[in-house]
Amino acid sequence: MPIMTTNKFSLTELLVTLSIVLILSAILLPVLNRGREIAKTIACTGNMKQSLTGLVMYLDTYDVVSTQSWTDTLLETGLVPQSQVSSLRCPSWVRKDDTHKNVFGMRRVMGDAHTLHITGSPSDYVLLADSLNLDTSRQFINFYGNWGPHKLVVHYRHHRKANAGFLDGSVRSSSQRELSEKGCPRYVY
C-alpha cells in the first residue's frame, strides 16, 4: 500500500502570498474609494437636478420663492414628495440632523426672494450650490459670503469642485474660478 504524502506550504511561500495580497489590496482600495466618491458626486448632481427642477417649476408658476424657506415650499406644494426629502441634500456630506435647513444652498439675494426676472443669461446664473455653514459645519439653506456674522458659503467638496444648479435647469460640477466667472459670490470655502 503506497504511503500518501501531503505537500504543505512552507512559511516563506505563505508569507510571499500574503504580501502579494496585501500589496494588491493597498493598490485597489484608493481606486475603490475614488469610485465611491465619484458615485456620490453623480448622486449629488441628480439630487440637485431634482431640487432645481422643482424650484424652476415653482418660479414659473408663482413668480417668486423665498431663500429662507425654499425647501418647505417645495415639500408643501408636492414638487418634492416628503418621501424624497433626501433629494434636497448632497450624499457626500454627513448630516448631523435632518432639519429643512440642512440642504443645498440657494443663492442669497437682496430681499431674500428669487424671481425668474434676471439680467443676463439663465445658464450663467447660479441658483443652487453645495453649501456650508462655517459655524456649524453643516450644509445650509442658502449662501452668500463669509463676512461679518454670515458664514454661509459655497462648499467645494467634490474633488475641489461644487455642484451648482443654474437657472436654465442645468447642474454642473464647477471650480471656484468657474463660479466666480458666473458672478457667484466670491466668498467660498
Where do the model's predicted regions map?
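Short, Lys/Arg-enriched N-terminal segments with co-localized hydrophobic residues
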Residues: 1-3
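N-terminal single-pass transmembrane signal-anchor helix
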Residues: 5-36
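Short, well-structured segments within or immediately adjacent to enzyme catalytic domains
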Residues: 37-189
